């Protein structure tokens, strides 16, 4: 974290929503290694029922999950007045869904497997931080 202010970075909570536990844990490990606080959820409904909505600085969510999809979550949050930056990750990329997510304000749309640098760049953009070298 040479170019990052640890106190500023660690105060940002990033919520990770994915029905695949191994993906959640991998993303959570990467984000924690960057100094961010994280909260992980197995579904969009679990996130919506949590007390983390108001203190989440960025959401990283799977696109396709049982119950509410990532796009459904984005719609619900926007309808409720929450403009939390969102980054979508998916094993099933679709140009139509990508366009919809980005048009609605998503900061990234990554296909699984994605490289860590791409995810970090999306997080930095979402949090308006400089991208590390």
Regions found by a protein language model. Give the residues of each.
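Active-site residues of response regulator receiver
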Residues: 62, 90
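Non-catalytic signal-transmission and effector/linker regions of two-component phosphorelay proteins
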Residues: 1-15, 21-28, 117-133
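Acidic catalytic/metal-coordinating carboxylates
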Residues: 42-43, 69-72
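Acidic, metal-coordinating helix/loop segments flanking the phosphotransfer/catalytic sites
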Residues: 40-58
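A Lys-centered signature of the CheY-like receiver
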Residues: 112
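Receiver (REC) domain active-site loop signature in two-component systems and cognate sites
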Residues: 65
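Short, conserved "switch-loop" micro-motifs in signal-transduction and mechanochemical regulators
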Residues: 80, 91-95
């Amino acid at each position: 974290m040479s170019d990052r202010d640890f106190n500023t970075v660690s105060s940002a909570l990033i919520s990770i929503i994915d029905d695949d536990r191994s993906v959640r844990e991998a993303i959570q490990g990467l984000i924690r290694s960057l100094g961010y606080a994280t909260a992980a959820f197995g579904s969009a409904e679990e996130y919506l029922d949590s007390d983390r909505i108001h203190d989440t600085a960025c959401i990283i969510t799977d696109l396709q999950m049982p119950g509410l999809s990532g796009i459904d979550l984005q719609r619900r949050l926007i309808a409720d007045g929450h403009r939390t930056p969102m980054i979508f990750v998916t094993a099933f990329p679709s140009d139509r869904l990508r366009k919809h997510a980005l048009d609605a304000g998503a900061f990234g749309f990554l296909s699984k497997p994605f490289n860590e640098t791409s995810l970090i760049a999306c997080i930095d953009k979402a949090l308006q931080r400089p991208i590390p070298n």
